[in-house]
Amino acid sequence: MANKTVLFNKHLESNAKMVDFHGWDMPLNYGSQIEEHHAVRQDAGMFDVSHMTVVDVTGTDACAFLRKLLANDVAKLKVPGKALYGGMLDDNAGIIDDLITYYLTDTFYRVVVNSATREKDLAWIAKQSQGFDVTVTERPELAMIAVQGPNAKAKAAAVFSSEQNAAIEGMKPFFGKQAGSLFIATTGYTGEVGYEIIVPETEAEALWQALLDQGVKPCGLGARDTLRLEAGMNLYGLDMDETINPLAANMGWTIAWEPTDRDFIGRKALEALRDAGTDKLVGLVMEEKGVLRHDMPVFFTDAAGVEQQGVITSGTFSPTLGYSIAMARVPNSIGDTAEVEMRKKRVAVRVVAPNFVRNGKQAF
């Protein structure tokens, strides 16, 4: 029996096509994935992300524990509400999950992890917390709605109370704040501005309906995937997993190497990988007809004249750009051109940074 979010009936009311997503019944689209994609790039769309796992870490050792658990360093978070993105690694520097951590007080952090990895994440966090004065509390009674797009903040403001709007006024990107019953964060998975709103399940349907009434378009997993890929954002299980280290997943920027005495889990293995050199995650652009897809092989000739091979991790047609884009894991020696094998022939592609669209505009 699949899990259903508290918004399941609202999806059916909007004629959603429901699919299984890691054991959850989730909307794939509400009629047109392309229209939903464009709504987020040009106006405002919303996603039910209540399947995500919210975990509160509290206690006198909360900071020390998270400094061990995560490759990024929560000690950098000085202002209440500030968040950071990073990887939770195993001893071999494989990525157990990627997650966002909010600093609320010195003894209270909120962590949002992926739904597909929920059970192994919770088990790993519980195991690693032994010996620390912390309490790890999953918050299944909380739902989450992401409102994204150039008009998302204005449309959400019409739904929030005057007190909530005052509480979040001027909030910078990558912050979260408790405003009444809502935890409102300036985060997202689309490359657009907007909010991710953590809401009690008892209030989620009313919030969804209020946003609908403001003209916010409901969007499904299909648009969520094309939007995140245009934005160059990794999807766990495709672009990285426990066999991949963050240096090979375009997550090097999320590793806090300093201070050198912070012994986070996976550090020694990661230092060895850094010194030896790893593959890297790049962007591919193909302006010919056709669509780049997961697992297609990528070929290029390096400076020494040797043919090298990589693989596409995520690929799609980009509705914003009008042609196909992909992320690919390739040897570090790649230049700015390559070939992808599709339908038994090789097609030329451009190699770019894995960031295709930001705030509705081409980013490369």
Swiss-Prot record:
Any one Pfam family match given in the protein's UniProt record, by short name: GCV_T_C
Catalytic reaction annotation: N(6)-[(R)-S(8)-aminomethyldihydrolipoyl]-L-lysyl-[protein] + (6S)-5,6,7,8-tetrahydrofolate = N(6)-[(R)-dihydrolipoyl]-L-lysyl-[protein] + (6R)-5,10-methylene-5,6,7,8-tetrahydrofolate + NH4(+)
One of the record's GO cellular component terms: cytosol
SUPFAM superfamilies the UniProt entry points to: Aminomethyltransferase beta-barrel domain (SSF101790), Folate-binding domain (SSF103025)
Cited Gene3D superfamilies: Aminomethyltransferase beta-barrel domains (3.30.70.1400), Aminomethyltransferase fragment (4.10.1250.10), Probable tRNA modification gtpase trme, domain 1 (3.30.1360.120)
EC numbers: 2.1.2.10
GO molecular-function term, one example from the UniProt record: transaminase activity
UniProt keyword Transferase present: yes
Keywords from the named record: Aminotransferase, Transferase
One of the GO biological process terms: glycine decarboxylation via glycine cleavage system
Disulphides: none
Top-level taxon of the source organism: Bacteria
Subunit-level organization: The glycine cleavage system is composed of four proteins: P, T, L and H.
Family, as annotated: Belongs to the GcvT family.
Function: The glycine cleavage system catalyzes the degradation of glycine.
Protein name according to UniProt: Aminomethyltransferase
Organism from which the protein derives: Shewanella sp. (strain MR-7)
